[in-house]
């Protein structure tokens, strides 16, 4: 009997920790909704994954202003106003570019917060400095912009998923 209870209790606890209600986007959703604050995203290597995770939640229109998938250099320059000099000097996958992406989309959308990603999802395109799975993420707030480099392993889809989660978790930290 005790083994059955323990097994049932363990299964229940595991189901709670795996439950999608614990996803970071749901926690951010609640915080932004409660504070009546807004969010915008600018994504390169994550290709709209972050925007999709937020807009999949009922009530996202209360805080989600826009998502820009800036995959090409032209889009980064024309829509997000990333400096040509910054891209030429540091490259598209850099702390400087992701910072400008987050600040640019926050400014353009007049949002309280913004998240941005740029990186190499793979399976090709890596360099010695930035191997496949290297992703710069940034969160821009009214007070500061925070950046972080992650190294996500696995397949292209795994890199995209991990980078999206890391970006949302960084946003949650900054809230």
Indicate where each model-derived feature is located:
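Short alpha-helical segments enriched in small residues
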Residues: 19-175
